[in-house]
Amino acid sequence: MKNLTHLQRLEAEAIHVFREVAATFSNPVMLYSVGKDSSVMLHLAMKAFYPAPPPFPFLHVDTTWKFREMIEFRDAQAREKGFELLVHVNEQGVRDGIGPFTHGSNVHTHIMKTVGLRQALDKYRFDAAFGGARRDEEKSRAKERIFSFRNAQHGWDPKNQRPEMWKIYNTRVSKGESIRVFPLSNWTELDIWQYILQENIPIVPLYFAARRPVVERDGMLIMVDDDRMKLRPGEQVENRLVRFRTLGCYPLTGAIPSSAANLSDIVEEMLIARTSERQGRAIDRDEAGSMEKKKREGYF
């Protein structure tokens, strides 16, 4: 038997996880946020069940504040790959006018993402949900299992999780409970980019450097993606050469100065990077809005 490369081992582990969930859960779903990790997850899911399509739908929780290029890419991928795409919006949040500019990152994220996700999981009665989180991203994710148990309220209790020895997973849940499943847990950001390069996986163009209209605000370069973003006194829109390491709601996602215009350039950039990709996410900036608190409330 030939020795597997590092990326082949990661790929094999992820495919095993996909198949384990398909075999043991009655109604799984994949959370499709449209970022680079979701693109890798989609690719792995297609591989895991080829030539059949993935035996589960793909769910996008739309906050109505995603980059326009993300939504265009999402719809194009669904048409091209032929997977079942479910889009859920927290309509009550929309009626209440919840948004990142009017209510801040914490309230917006909780209402439009966390509550929206809980609504969708309850509506369709999913008992397992794939997510693209990785342990290298953030400290609370570093201690999360691949099969992350959630209670009937979708909450995560890090003290009430199950051992995962020898890649044997406990998939039993009672009525109303569910499991969040993270096939990319052991991948790093560099692994993701090297795999995207190796497999030639399509990704949102925002990951590549280009001249974009940005405003420097609260220590971040925020892209002006539509007319809902109002300038503060003294702010000016500049066309700067930037790209994004992570994607989310555009008012809460900071760009980085970069000239990496192709996948090889991005991999080279990652080899010397000394900061986390999460530095560009406003929702991780303070303790009150910490990732662990959000996950306990039912966040991804």
Swiss-Prot record:
Q: Which InterPro entries would you find in this protein's record?
A: PAPS_reduct_dom (IPR002500), Rossmann-like_a/b/a_fold (IPR014729), SO4_adenylTrfase_ssu (IPR011784), Sulfate_adenylyltrnsfr_sub2 (IPR050128)
Question: Pathway involvement?
Answer: Sulfur metabolism; hydrogen sulfide biosynthesis; sulfite from sulfate: step 1/3
Give EC number(s), comma-separated.
2.7.7.4
Q: Which GO terms describe its biological process?
A: hydrogen sulfide biosynthetic process; sulfate assimilation
In the record, what terms sit under GO molecular function? ATP binding; sulfate adenylyltransferase (ATP) activity
Disordered: annotated span = 281-300
What keywords sit in the KW lines?
A: ATP-binding, Nucleotide-binding, Nucleotidyltransferase, Transferase
Q: Which reaction does it catalyse?
A: sulfate + ATP + H(+) = adenosine 5'-phosphosulfate + diphosphate
> Looking at the keywords, is NAD present?
no
In this record, what's one Pfam family? Answer: PAPS_reduct
Its domain of life reads Bacteria
Q: How does it assemble?
A: Heterodimer composed of CysD, the smaller subunit, and CysN.
Q: Which family does it belong to?
A: Belongs to the PAPS reductase family. CysD subfamily.
Q: What does this protein do?
A: With CysN forms the ATP sulfurylase (ATPS) that catalyzes the adenylation of sulfate producing adenosine 5'-phosphosulfate (APS) and diphosphate, the first enzymatic step in sulfur assimilation pathway. APS synthesis involves the formation of a high-energy phosphoric-sulfuric acid anhydride bond driven by GTP hydrolysis by CysN coupled to ATP hydrolysis by CysD.
Q: What is this protein called?
A: Sulfate adenylyltransferase subunit 2
Q: What species is this protein from? A: Brucella canis (strain ATCC 23365 / NCTC 10854 / RM-666)
Gene name of the record: cysD
